[in-house]
């Protein structure tokens, strides 16, 4: 069976609580069945109380954290255009990074390209 799951607050909790993504109190379930595939989308939720600088910083911190956790857990972090082609055909566990709030842009149009770059090749935001 192929399974698609959207996590709206798991990534935020893991980052802000300094916990592991597979913490049993979260709803992340890894697929151990080689005949099925699981795609889990991790949205970075940004509270309305954050100012633009804090939201931008939390976005990049979350992107780095998700990449690290996917490496640790053996989850394939997919880039733009990959998820529909590969998630249910190649990988037992895959993930897609999303953002839930435009506040992460912090009023900087150049962040659109920076965010896309992270999604295209899973690079860190550091250059």
Feature locations, PLM:
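N-terminal hydrophobic targeting/anchoring segments and the immediately downstream early-domain regions
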Residues: 1-126
């Amino acid at each position: 069976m192929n399974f698609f799951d959207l996590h709206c607050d798991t990534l935020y909790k893991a980052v802000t609580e300094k916990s592991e993504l597979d913490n049993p109190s979260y709803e992340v379930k890894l697929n151990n069945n080689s005949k099925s595939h699981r795609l889990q989308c991790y949205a970075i939720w940004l509270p309305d109380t954050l100012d633009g600088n804090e939201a931008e910083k939390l976005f990049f911190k979350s992107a780095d954290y998700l990449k690290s956790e996917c490496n640790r857990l053996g989850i394939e972090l997919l880039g733009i255009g990959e998820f529909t082609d590969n998630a249910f055909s190649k990988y037992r566990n895959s993930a897609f990074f999303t953002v839930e709030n435009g506040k992460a842009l912090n009023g900087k149009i150049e962040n659109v390209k920076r965010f896309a770059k992270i999604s295209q090749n899973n690079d860190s935001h550091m250059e």
